[in-house]
């Protein structure tokens, strides 16, 4: 009577359905990538199949012959006599976190730069107002517009920072930010 044993779905497809025998780790990795039919990282695929090979050797299901890159792995009689069944495949639920969110970091940095410029503009308007009090009526409008722009930019920076924290799994701590734009008063 044959023993029934569950093995990983990938190894089942590779060793039983595709009847791979006398393979190297690289060959098994390449076949693994083909059956996964996805853009899996070759290094990760290598690690996964190598761990499986070691597990199968430990159970006496595979033997290795040779050394280094020339090492080849063969199915043992024990494995061939084994009634293997595939484990149910894990369904990979990939939240779209694999997307490249570096654009968000770039946008945040751009807004930070713009905020610094606007804050410098506000400082200059205040300085001009002190040096040339007769310009105050004209500077007030410019100062108010710069304050509004700085508040808008600060909101964008904070929003992007919070989103990036959520994506990286950090806890968002709401802080009160004070900027030069919010601290100065009309003189």
Curated annotation (Swiss-Prot):
An MF annotation (GO) of this entry: DNA-binding transcription factor activity
GO BP terms: negative regulation of DNA-templated transcription
Stated induction or repression of this protein's expression: Expression is repressed by the TCP island-encoded sRNA TarB.
UniProt keyword annotation of DNA-binding present: yes
Transcription listed as a keyword: yes
UniProt keyword annotations, A-Z: DNA-binding, Repressor, Transcription, Transcription regulation
Taxonomy, superkingdom: Bacteria
Function, in words: Represses the transcription of several genes encoded within the Vibrio 7th pandemic island-1 (VSP-1), including dncV, VC_0176, VC_0178 and VC_0180.
Designated name of the protein: Transcriptional regulator VspR
Source organism (scientific name): Vibrio cholerae serotype O1 (strain ATCC 39315 / El Tor Inaba N16961)
The encoding gene: vspR
């Amino acid at each position: 009577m044959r023993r029934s044993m569950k093995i990983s779905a990938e190894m089942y497809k590779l060793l039983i359905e595709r009847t791979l025998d006398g393979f190297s780790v690289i060959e098994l990795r390449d076949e693994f990538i083909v059956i996964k039919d996805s853009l899996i990282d070759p290094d990760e695929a290598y690690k996964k199949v190598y761990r499986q090979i070691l597990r199968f050797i430990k159970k006496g299901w595979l033997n290795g012959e040779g050394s280094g890159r020339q090492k080849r792995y063969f199915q043992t009689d024990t494995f061939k006599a084994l009634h293997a069944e595939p484990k149910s495949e894990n369904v990979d639920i990939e939240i779209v976190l694999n997307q490249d969110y570096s654009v968000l970091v770039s946008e945040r940095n751009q807004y930070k730069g713009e905020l610094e410029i606007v804050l410098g503009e506000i400082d200059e308007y205040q300085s001009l107002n002190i040096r040339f009090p007769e310009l105050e009526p004209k500077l007030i409008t410019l100062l108010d517009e710069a304050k509004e722009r700085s508040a808008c930019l600060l909101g964008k920076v904070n929003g992007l920072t919070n989103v990036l924290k959520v994506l990286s799994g950090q806890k968002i701590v709401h802080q009160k930010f004070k900027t030069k734009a919010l601290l100065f008063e009309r003189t």
